[in-house]
């Protein structure tokens, strides 16, 4: 992707699990995700449903920063130059902590920014690392990668914001970005960005249900979008429900089910080796869960410690496999769709509306790809009202439209 001088429409969808950087591509008349090959999720695939261009929202602080690294954090220089490096972010940070999680690793920081910005999340030597420190380091290294790829320093940026976010969250993000030389920071509510990203015309008021299920949470928000509010990047919240239920919980359920089949008790041991193996097996459970989004069934390629890799001695022999039907059964058994139904019914009841009053249903977040998720909403709201084809990109795309003031140019959506 070519970048024009003074590139307009820079946007950041800062997520709990993954983050996306987008900008408005004037030559194509549409928003584009910015590929940051050094830190993005995957380099070997171009399938958008695997979110290859998103950046994992993780941070690993450098244990022994050099003189230049420390100098680069001095405020007068930080606003003008990216000297040295403070931390690893994205894929390199995950790879650095594969198997063993180091004290300097921060697996997530966004949830703490709203009210606990000074809460310690990691440690570098004898010094604690707070949520604020982690957010600052992540944003700093992300902007540095954008500069490497585009040749430009971002000075004007739109950041997406959850409708439930406190003003303290926005203040923390704004302060961090201004410290890094971003002169103009604007925010857009995630429902507004999702609507724009899915190509919804906001030339008249409409009632929209936004369902966001990512790695850690399930958010169901019913909003009223109007031209005036949308122009300010705001959505009128009619009702909302949130649960600490997302892809991470599903990974644990999958692992428990497959270990049960292998005859392994995950809770039997709690030593360091067992904890390391559990982290590795959770990562493998996540892999097979995501793989069955695209394949009918997938082999689980890791065995518990002390058991043979192929599990040939297990009754029935062969490898342990996961298929879509089995994953759907696990979700039903654990009450995933029951919780989703209660959330949807709850926001409708709270707002005094019915399913027929909802004009659009927007699905965002990687866990909306779970088997049965789309059909759940299709049965309740009809296929024509459900938009689900770009769960990873929609919010970032919409933020780029807002940043470039192209809210009335939505014919790039197919």
Regions from the language model: what does each represent?
Residues 34-180, 252-301:
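Phosphate-binding loop and its immediate beta->loop->alpha context
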Residues 47-50, 186-192, 244-245, 387-397:
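Active-site nucleophile and cofactor-binding loops and adjacent substrate-binding regions
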Residues 1-7, 185-211, 350, 394-410:
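Conserved phosphate-binding catalytic cores of ATP/NTP-utilizing and phosphoryl-transfer enzymes
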Residues 2-31, 201-235, 363:
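Gly/Thr-rich phosphate-binding beta-strand-loop-beta motif of the actin/hexokinase/Hsp70
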Residues 105, 129-139, 169, 188, ...:
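Phosphate/oxyanion-binding active-site loops and adjacent basic polyanion-contact surfaces
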Residues 137, 258-263, 294-413:
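Helical "lid/coupling" subdomains associated with nucleotide-phosphate turnover
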Residues 47-64, 225-272, 315-343, 401:
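Glycine-rich phosphate-binding loop plus the immediately following alpha-helix
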Residues 3, 14-16, 36-38, 233, ...:
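Acidic, glycine/GT-rich loop-and beta-edge segments that sit at the periphery of enzyme/chaperone cores
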């Amino acid at each position: 992707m070519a970048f024009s001088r003074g590139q307009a429409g820079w946007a950041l969808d800062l997520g709990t699990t993954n983050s996306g950087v987008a900008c408005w591509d004037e030559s194509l008349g549409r928003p584009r995700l910015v590929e940051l090959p050094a830190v993005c999720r995957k380099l070997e695939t171009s399938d958008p449903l695997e979110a290859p261009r998103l950046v994992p929202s993780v941070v690993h602080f450098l244990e022994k920063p050099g003189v230049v690294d420390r100098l680069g954090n001095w405020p007068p220089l930080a606003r003008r130059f990216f000297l040295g490096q403070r931390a690893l972010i994205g894929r390199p940070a995950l790879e650095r902590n594969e198997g063993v999680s180091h004290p300097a690793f921060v697996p997530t920081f966004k949830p703490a920014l709203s009210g606990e910005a000074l809460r310690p999340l990691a440690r570098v030597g004898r010094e604690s690392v707070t949520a604020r420190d982690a957010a600052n380091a992540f944003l700093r290294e992300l902007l540095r990668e954008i500069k490497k790829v585009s040749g430009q320093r971002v000075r004007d940026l739109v950041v997406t914001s959850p409708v439930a976010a406190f003003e303290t969250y926005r203040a923390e993000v704004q302060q961090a970005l201004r410290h890094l030389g971003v002169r103009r920071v604007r925010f857009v509510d995630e429902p507004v960005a999702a609507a724009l990203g899915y190509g919804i015309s906001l030339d008249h008021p409409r009632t929209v249900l936004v369902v966001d299920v990512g790695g850690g949470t399930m958010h169901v928000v019913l909003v009223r979008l109007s031209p005036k509010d949308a122009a300010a990047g705001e959505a009128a919240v009619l009702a909302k429900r949130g649960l600490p239920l997302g892809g991470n919980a599903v990974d644990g359920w999958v692992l428990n089910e497959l270990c049960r089949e292998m005859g392994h008790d995950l809770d039997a041991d709690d030593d360091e080796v067992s904890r390391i193996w559990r982290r590795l097996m959770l990562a493998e459970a996540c892999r097979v869960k995501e793989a069955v989004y695209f394949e009918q069934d997938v082999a689980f390629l890791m065995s518990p410690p002390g058991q043979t890799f192929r599990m040939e001695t297990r009754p029935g022999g062969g490898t342990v496999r996961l298929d879509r039907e089995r994953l759907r059964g696990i979700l039903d058994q654990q009450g995933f769709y029951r919780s989703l139904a209660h959330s949807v019914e709850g926001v409708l009841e709270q707002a005094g509306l019915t399913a027929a009053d909802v004009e659009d249903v927007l699905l965002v977040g990687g866990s909306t790809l779970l088997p049965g998720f789309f059909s759940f909403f299709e049965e309740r709201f009809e296929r024509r009202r459900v938009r689900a084809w770009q769960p990873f990109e929609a919010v970032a795309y919409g933020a780029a439209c807002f940043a470039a003031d192209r809210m009335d140019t939505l014919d790039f959506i197919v």
